[in-house]
């Protein structure tokens, strides 16, 4: 049984749970027993003996040895007490070495007191053990107190249990360092106890090993488990001694309980190993170092064992009493120190008791929880077992059904095998008969083929001659093509020449007429040449047509051959399809895997039969191929003859068609002559038109010349400097130019018409040439057709003779083809039977291969599971890499957030700079225009916008990367789903393999875990997307705020520009108004001074000053000066008003700066609020993730349960599908049986044919009978011919012997027929038996007749001798 089987796994889980529960109970029972023991110890406590300072070093050494030998096993502890009991009597030598300063009276009193205490404690513990054994079986083994040290397995030896409290006090000194180990005693004790239980079960199987281990364990000092120190008064000095006694009693009880099961098995081994144990004990006593208390305990044990040792000890005690008194005094000194240590230990014990109470409460809660969990697990276990039981019953039912179907299929297969054997026998007999017939037919075919081969040789020679003629014709065609190319070149040269002539035709009309005459002559010569060329072309075309027709005939013959080949291929395909059907049927018949071993044997026999059949078939195939080749030769001969006939028929048809074509050609010639006449008339008309156009062209040229002269005159007139005539002649010039343009247009149209007419002339000349050539070719064709008509008479006689020969050959070929088809059908039947056998063998081989493949699949499934595990590991690595990438992306996002913050800081700095610049602008409005500063601000803002666009691009790239990662996750999910499907398929295939089911479930769990990880990654991606969207929103808000700030800046800039423009315009207007006023005033003041208004104001003022000074020199007055002072005051007031307006504009700019600062502050406050909200949302997301994870765990648990149910359903469906397959196979077998029956009917038909042949042979025998009767009559009538008959007797005997052989053959065939028809109907068998009986009777009758004839002959001879 494997570990991962379901039944073993179900049993193991509850057993582990039960052991854990018993461990918890054991710990609690231990604590309760410890309290009871403490109460008993308080009653009987006494002061222990003192210790010496010299023995402390020895105790430390013993502690080290005990620490080395702390992990003693329970199986060894069971065997060690016997060793001590056997060797107690012999330990006096070691006892005398250690000094024992005690009197005999003290020793005896101590022994009595201890015996009484041990009896009381044993009685109390026996009662307690009986109670616990009734409550639970395991509590009796777990009565030990909770230890403080790290050694949880106490030894069960009585010698180690009787150690005195001197050693324990020394251990209590180190109790401060070991309080940490008290908190978890139960946890450290559980694995050791489990190990002890496993070892106790295997004690019976490991006796020899335990005996060897005991030798080693005796050499090492045993460790006494330390116990809790009770709360006792300082006056109770003997409490430690009583505690040891209680521990000894407990250990004895535990030993009694543990040894009750194994005493019987160990008595035999202890007797065998007694001597070895004694030696080991002596060696151990020599090596050990005892304290006084330990030595006293050993002596008491030895006293109990033997009385002789008591006398020896009394003598030794008298001698050493003085030394003991000194030691007692030293020990009393040590008691004071020990009491102080005991007080410290009491305080520690109080603390430990409080901790114990807290641990008890904790353990109570844990036990309650464990009980609830165990109850739930038991319920689930029960439901699971019920489900498994139901599924197991269903599977058993399905197996029973499957076995029944298998048995049915085996019975059917056996029946089919019997039928196959019968069919094989019938096939073998039929093949023998067919081979004999085929041999005779082949001889006939060979003779016919020899004749046909001779005829083929003659026709091949004729074909070679025809090919030579064709080659000559092809050479002539090539020459004609060359001539055509040369004619085309000449034609192109003529076209070029005509174009040149048309160009010269425009220059002079008289030369044109002469040239036209010359051209006509040339055209006639060319036309004659072209007609010659056309005639040669037509001849070549006729030859080409003949060649093409011959090639078409050949192509038709090849097509017919291809059609026949295709038909044969189709027949082969049909046969292959039938063979494939038979293959599938035979494979379905032999699908049972149970027959694999039997079929191997059958395959070997059938392989031998197949080899024989294949050899025979190979011979038949060779014969058939030779026959097919001969047939092909005959068919080629036929085709060649038919082609010749077709040629002759074609010639006759061509001759008939040529007569019709002659008539058509004559008609077409008349039509073309009419066309030529019409074209010549059109040419003449067009020539007249060209002459007229040329005359008009000359007239227009003359008019142009006159107009040009007039234009020159007008230009001369224009050159004259008379203005009134210029205006009058303008109209005339315009009219003249219009006329000139109209005439130029007319000239152009006339030229175009002339060119079109020349082109038409050239085209019509070409058409004339073509028509002339066609006429000449038609005339030549007429001549050739007349020649062919004269040759027709000679061809017709040849055609008739050839047709007769062809009809004869066709009859022969048809007979040969029929014979071949019959043979092909026979061979096809044989091939079918052979292929059926090969299919059976292949099916058997396939079944064996399938059985092997199934065995290999079972091995491959384990490898697939391993591969899936490796794939899952790879997927885990991919998931880890994805997580690392996500972490990197998160880091990048954080970095980008920091960059955004930095950019926001830069934006704040820029806004502050903008404010500073605005302030500077307000200060420098009078000096520098505001437009340049606004442009700087716009450039900076544009730079910031570019940075923001870059950030947008970076964010979009990151979003794309995240989208790609999401796609990768989706692909991972799809792969995981595919892995799920593969795992489910593996489950369905491995329903029978319980060992691999556990592994597949583990793989599903791993896949589910990976899906969880993927889901968590998707959630993280969604969170990151949300974070990205939030950051986008933030960025959008910041952009909107920046845009608002930009809009505010733009509005302020526009306002400032408008105001500056307004102020500038107003200033200019004011300045202009002031300048105008000043001029007017100055002119009013000095009316006699006048200056031009186009001069600038400054020049005007300078000039006016000069003029005014000159004027003032002449006339001076004080009143004018006063008026000027008043005007200056008014100008100063205007200047003050302008300054006030500038201050107002500055205040407006300051207000806009304040608005921008407020916007920045609001933006920063909103950013802080958003950050707080983001942190709160992240906390909420973490909480939601934790809750979602818990819900996902529950959902996955439910999914696993659902998957288990689905697996059971799938198993059921799989079994149902197997049943359906079995039913389908059964139906296929039935159909195959029907087909085999059809084959049997066909074979019966063939046998009937053979039976008809036998009847025919019987008729021949009857004819022979008639002949014999005629011979007898002749013998009776013609006695004179007896001498001749006597000479012909040996020949007649030979003929009779041959007849008897033939009759024997017929009888053998009849027997074969009877043997082959084992499975036929009863009527056929009766008929054939009657035929055989009749044949035998006829043969007997013939023999009697022969005997009578011989007797008559002998009598005739005797009579002849007597006559002589």
From Swiss-Prot:
It is a single-pass type II membrane protein. Residues 1-6 are cytoplasmic. GO terms for biological process: microtubule-based movement; protein transport. Residues 30-1364 are lumenal. A cytoplasmic form lacking the first 232 amino acids has been characterized. Belongs to the kinectin family. Parallel homodimers formed between the membrane-bound and the cytosolic form, and also between 2 cytosolic forms. Receptor for kinesin thus involved in kinesin-driven vesicle motility. This is Kinectin. The lineage of its organism: Eukaryota, Metazoa, Chordata, Craniata, Vertebrata.
